Regions:
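Residue-level signal for inorganic ion chemistry
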Residues: 33, 52, 88, 110, ...
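Long amphipathic alpha-helix in the N-terminal Rossmann-like dinucleotide-binding domain
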Residues: 70-71, 89, 93-105, 116-142
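Rossmann-like NAD(P) dinucleotide-binding subdomain of oxidoreductase/dehydrogenase enzymes
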Residues: 100, 145-284, 413
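Conserved C-terminal structural/oligomerization subdomain of aldehyde/semialdehyde dehydrogenase
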Residues: 51-57, 238, 275, 329, ...
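ALDH superfamily catalytic-core signature
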Residues: 248-393, 456, 502-503, 508-513, ...
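Short, well-ordered beta-strand elements within core beta-sheets of diverse protein domains
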Residues: 54-61, 76-82, 164, 274-277, ...
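Hydrophobic face of amphipathic alpha-helices that form TPR/SEL1-like repeat modules
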Residues: 2-50, 521
Length: 524
């Protein structure tokens, strides 16, 4: 099936203003297996953060758009849930193939609307998404959906209509991380991408369509969180809501879903610490921390934004971090030599700049590298300077709040116990790292992190392991079996027993009369 989507040249560099054509205009939403006109009166401008020029306009979706998408999903759900798992996974393998075929198109769109450097968009944004999608499908293919427990048959079945609300920072990866498990579980999905980055989602709708999923199983609607998102989350026919976003957005979604007692899964923010113990290889640990902290220009929930080092080695660590940052190139994301692109929007540029200014003026922190404003030579685009603060008070604003930019806060500590208090001393609990010359010591310390993920001496991400946070970093888990189970309900079917067995449960008689067990089963 061929679906009209963003033209392949949408990610090309902007022309000179005097000759620039009007940006593409899209007026439709993907509902019930086809593009249908939105009834939105207003529009959203999708902006290239590197040039500040418009890329396209899309509808500011309405509550009516959300309602139509949810009803299409609800109509498709029974048939999709009843489809055997082997058939669902076979169709979803076509989706994985479609992601691979369109990898360069996805990368171009992500570079254009997110500002991710082109080689990183292809290798990481898209490459990880393809790998994650494949892993999700194979997890479902090997999952045990039914098992006997004593005289009960325990069945795990699709939870219903799932609303998947995804962010702008690593949009394709975080979308497939939700949608593929939901679809593999047998749920019908309504996807709401961020209004900042909807263009890749149009291409994703095409990929699903070409895989021949039944109409209504996948729907995609674009709009703001306050209008379309709120209508989607609160819709009475939505059974499960899965959101990745800010902690503020998570609170709003929880409140909106409370009246319907919906299942809510939240992957939220983080103020993640990289803890370098006193026996660790400091240069290696600092280099790894800086590299991770700068990925996606610091716009990831997993970012190690706090670097904890022994007090007597802080100056050395700061110098190592400063030199490491100097080795990264900030600039045009379409240039293969670029490591750091712009922030995603003018609002993000203003927010990060304000944090940097506050960090330099309060709490006794020392600005060791970078600072507010654009890097030298860049006058257009939402570019910021990679920044290092030293002597950061763990209780200060920059020590506590998620900045979501390329800002590293170095915090000295005096002993292991103090270091762990600092690590665990925020409202977040998503990710962390610990570095030591002794793997056993590093693992022991990692067990004391109040976080959902900890990298021990550079251990890499594992898509089979649960992903999620403690405290205000979220509720629930994604990835692996846990990610699939987020979209499943569990049913226990008590099967008839041999005569004379003891009855346990809300019964008046100790044992059922002859034939009662068989009769109850026939009548039920």
């Amino acid at each position: 099936m061929t679906v009209l989507t963003v033209p392949q040249d949408a990610a090309a560099p902007a022309a000179e203003p005097a000759a620039a054509p009007l940006p593409p205009r899209y007026d439709d939403q993907w509902i019930g297996g086809r593009w249908t006109a939105s009834d939105a009166d207003s529009r959203l401008v999708v902006t290239d953060p590197a040039t500040e020029a418009p890329l396209a306009t899309v509808p500011a979706g309405t509550a009516h758009d959300a309602d139509r998408a949810v009803r299409a999903a609800a109509e498709a759900f029974p048939g999709w849930a009843a489809t055997p798992v082997r058939e669902r996974t076979a169709l979803l393998r076509r989706v994985v193939e479609g992601l691979e075929r369109n990898a360069e198109r996805f990368a171009g769109l992500i570079t254009a609307e997110v500002g991710a450097p082109s080689r990183i968009a292809l290798r990481t944004h898209v490459g990880l998404a393809v790998g994650m999608a494949a892993h999700c499908v194979e997890t479902a293919a090997s999952y045990t959906f039914e098992e006997r427990v004593g005289h009960s048959l325990v069945v795990r079945e699709a939870a219903g209509v799932a609303a998947c609300v995804t962010p702008w920072n690593t949009p394709l990866l975080l979308t497939v991380q939700k949608m593929l498990p939901a679809l593999a579980a047998g749920c019908a999905v309504v996807h709401k991408p961020s209004e900042l980055t909807p263009l890749h989602a149009r291409l994703l709708a095409e990929v699903f369509a070409e895989a021949d999923l039944p109409p209504g199983v996948v729907n995609m609607v674009v709009g703001t969180g306050d209008t379309l998102g709120a209508a989607l989350v609160s819709h009475p026919l939505v059974d499960v809501v899965s959101l990745t976003g800010s902690t503020r957005a998570g609170r709003q979604v929880s409140a909106l879903g409370a009246d319907g007692v919906k299942r809510i899964h939240l992957e939220l923010g983080g103020k993640n610490a990289s803890l370098v113990l006193d026996d660790a290889d400091l240069p290696a640990a600092v280099a790894a921390t800086v590299d991770q902290a700068l990925f996606n220009t610091g716009q990831t929930c997993l970012q190690w934004s706090r670097l904890l080092v022994p007090r007597d080695r802080q100056d050395e660590a700061v110098e190592l971090a400063r030199r490491a940052m100097d080795g990264y190139v900030t600039g045009d994301p379409r240039d293969p030599a670029t490591d750091l692109g712009p922030l995603v929007s003018a609002a993000a540029y203003a927010r990060v700049g304000e944090y940097v200014r506050r960090g330099a003026t309060e709490g006794g922190a020392r600005l060791a590298h970078g600072g507010p404003g654009r890097p030298e030579g860049l006058t257009t685009g939402y570019y910021v300077r990679p920044t290092v603060f030293a002597d950061v008070d763990p209780l200060s604003t920059i020590g506590q709040e998620e900045i979501f930019g390329p800002v590293l806060c170095v915090m000295p500590y005096d002993d292991e116990e103090q270091a762990l208090r600092i690590v665990n001393g925020t409202r977040y609990g998503l990710h962390g790292a610990v570095w030591s010359a002794d793997d056993a010591r590093a693992e022991r310390v990692a067990r004391r992190f109040r976080t959902g993920l900890v990298d021990v001496n550079g251990g890499s991400f594992n898509p089979a392991a649960p992903f999620g946070g403690f405290k205000q970093s979220g509720i629930g888990r994604e990835c692996g079996n846990a990610g699939l189970e987020a979209f499943l309900e569990t049913k226990s079917m008590q099967l008839p027993q041999e005569q004379g067995g003891q009855v346990v449960g809300p019964r008046l008689r100790a044992t059922p009369p002859a034939g009662a067990a068989r009769q109850e089963r026939n009548d039920g």
